[in-house]
Design a protein with these regions (language model features):
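Terminal amphipathic helices with adjacent charged low-complexity linkers/tails
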Residues: 1, 155, 159-161
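Intein/HINT protein-splicing elements and their conserved insertion hotspots or analogous self-processing inserts
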Residues: 1-9, 13-14
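Flexible, glycine/charged-enriched surface loops at secondary-structure junctions
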Residues: 2, 22-27, 128
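Hydrophobic residues within alpha-helices
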Residues: 5, 57-58, 106
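Anionic-ligand anchoring segments at beta-strand to alpha-helix junctions in alpha/beta enzyme folds, i.e.
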Residues: 11-26, 36-91, 118
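Phosphate/diphosphate-binding loops
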Residues: 91, 95-130, 134-150, 156
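Conserved small/polar residues in nucleotide/adenosyl-binding loops
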Residues: 165-172
Length: 172
C-alpha cells in the first residue's frame, strides 16, 4: 500500500494525459452526450466501497459549481430504491474494475428508465464501459491494495475534469 500511495502523482499524470491542455479540457468519451448531461435536472452517482466515497466528493464538487442536485447511493441500494429516474436524469456509475455486480445492476436500471448513463472506471472494455452511454477511463493502472488509493485519486480527478470541461463547453 505504501508503494501505491507514492504512485498517486503518476496516477494523476496518467489520468490527465491527453485530456488537459493549457487552453482546454478534452473528454472525448463524453462529448456525444454532453448536451444531455448539461440539460439534466438531477444526477445520481452510484458505486460501491471506495468508489462510493469518491462519489461523495463528486457530489460536493458538482453541487458547488452547478444548480443540479446530486444524490449518491450505494449501488446495492440504488437498484432496489424507488429513485426518480427519467430521460432528464444522469446516472454516473463509478467502479474501479468496471465489473462490480451491484454497480452493473444499477446501470441496467438507469438504462431501463431512459437515463443518460456515464461510467468512470479503470478497465477499458469492462462491462461498465460497454453498458453505459458514455464515460471516461481513469488509467490508474493495476492496484494491489484493498484501499484502492490510486483508483480513488483518479476517480476524483475525473469528476473534477468534468467540471473543468463544463466551463470549457460554456466558453464555446
Amino acid at each position: 500500500m505504501h508503494k501505491e500511495i507514492h504512485e498517486q502523482v503518476d496516477t494523476i499524470a496518467n489520468t490527465m494525459r491527453g485530456r488537459i491542455r493549457p487552453d482546454a479540457v478534452l473528454l472525448h468519451g463524453l462529448s456525444e452526450y454532453w448536451d444531455e448531461i448539461e440539460a439534466s435536472n438531477r444526477i445520481y452517482i452510484t458505486a460501491c466501497g471506495t468508489s462510493w466515497h469518491a462519489g461523495l466528493i463528486g457530489k460536493l464538487l458538482i453541487e458547488k459549481f452547478s444548480n443540479t442536485p446530486v444524490f449518491v447511493e450505494y449501488a446495492s441500494e440504488f437498484r432496489y430504491n424507488h429513485t426518480l429516474i427519467d430521460s432528464q436524469t444522469v446516472v454516473i456509475a463509478i467502479s474501479q474494475s468496471g465489473e462490480t455486480a451491484d454497480t452493473l445492476a444499477a446501470v441496467q436500471k438507469a438504462n431501463d428508465y431512459g437515463a443518460v448513463t456515464m461510467g468512470i472506471c479503470n478497465v477499458p472494455g469492462s462491462s461498465v464501459g460497454r453498458e453505459t452511454d458514455c464515460g471516461i477511463y481513469t488509467r490508474c493502472g493495476h492496484e494491489v491494495g484493498v484501499a484502492s488509493t490510486k483508483a480513488f485519486t483518479a476517480q476524483i480527478s475525473i469528476l473534477y475534469f468534468c467540471l473543468l470541461y463544463t466551463s470549457d463547453a460554456a466558453d464555446e
